[in-house]
């Protein structure tokens, strides 16, 4: 099902069939206060005994990215299946959020505002997940935030990306070299914005604990591979977040 090469896994489209603990049908629609105005948000409710809370950030808004993106939705469903309350929001200028697109700079502040809201609402350890642009702007502030315990980069854009300028933008991820939190990177093996060689080179420089999963046959948008994406996130959460937290509780380190 999963082929291992060091810490890198390659999936070939077979089902993991993990049992979910909880999946909420309760969705709260609201606005949270951001640094550039109100941010449109959705919260999928968690279980009463939730152990973590999570936020999932969407891809580039100038190319149609919103909180309703399919990859964002499936990532949310994976996290919510463990009973975690999961927040999605539209960056400034996207959807009906206030403000204007800020080329990734102000959007990092939006991530901080979302983390603050999530912390104030639930007072739980947090998990950050971001897809594409969402990963590019959200991983840095999440690495620096002690309240965030685990990170998920989906389709992390390590290659040049045509953005809102004439020159394609290359995002930098050097900060990950100092990030010792639990980390999952999951991408399509044919990701046109995250070339495999560059992603593996970055992964080699990132400290443990970490995991890289490449889904065979998948492109940047995981077309036809969304189930595998969801199952990959579920498997990692079960292994790296749930089991790890339980072990720490038993040892008294939490």
PLM ranges: what are they?
Residues 47-88:
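Short, surface-exposed "cap/lid" segments of acyl-processing enzymes
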Residues 101-121:
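Alpha/beta-hydrolase active-site loop
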Residues 189-194, 220-221:
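Acidic catalytic loop of the alpha/beta-hydrolase fold
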Residues 205-221:
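Catalytic histidine neighborhood in serine/cysteine hydrolases
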Residues 218-230:
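Catalytic histidine-centered segment of alpha/beta-hydrolase-like enzymes
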